[in-house]
Amino acid sequence: MSYAEKYEQQMKEFLQVCRRLSENMYVTSHGGNLAWRLEQDLILITPTKLNKGDIRREDLVFIDLNGKRIEGQREPTGETPMYLNFFGQRKDISSVIHCHPPFTNAFAVMQGENRLMRPTFPETTTEVGPVPVVPYGEPLTQKLADNFLPFLRKYNAFLMENHGLVIMSPEGIYRTLELIEILEVTSQSLVAALSCGEIKEISREDVQDLDNTMRTRNLPLFGAPGEIKSLVDLYFA
């Protein structure tokens, strides 16, 4: 049995997410890419040089953790080295999406304080977490992939400086899309608020309450397992 047959349902979901990203204008032209680890050494990934809204089942590619194409007719995305870093450094991660949602991307080019590192809305604080800016590296290069290394074990969402967003999740590809949508709505609200005045953050005490709620519900913290002890440490250390 081929991998395309074995993972037919996952490929359908993957394509649905590709189309949703395109419809939401989170990706345009050939921009953005997605990857989903289906087995320890098997990754489903988008091909290079295709609009995500136009990708079909036969365009998808299976690669291993060395970047070798295992199945599929097309070449994998040129950002494959970046994804290999992600999956190699974070054994807990199942899916990753890189895209360019416009309001979130505003913070990738904004000078001054990065407001996405601060707690402003409960849902974003507990589900997405802080979003650090990864220093600029030319797209499709090993340098860009390496620039993530100081951040990978502590966070699950990242802004590539002057480039775009990366979000990863220990769950499936659709959940990662949901996290992008949560963050983009938050970013839109922050951009609107900044045009009117100052941002009001969630207090340390209220973040502690959110942390207690996460523990009660057995929700995982961000970053590699065991790396972060509490939301308070993450936002206020």
Language model regions located:
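Glycine-rich flexible loops
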Residues: 1-237
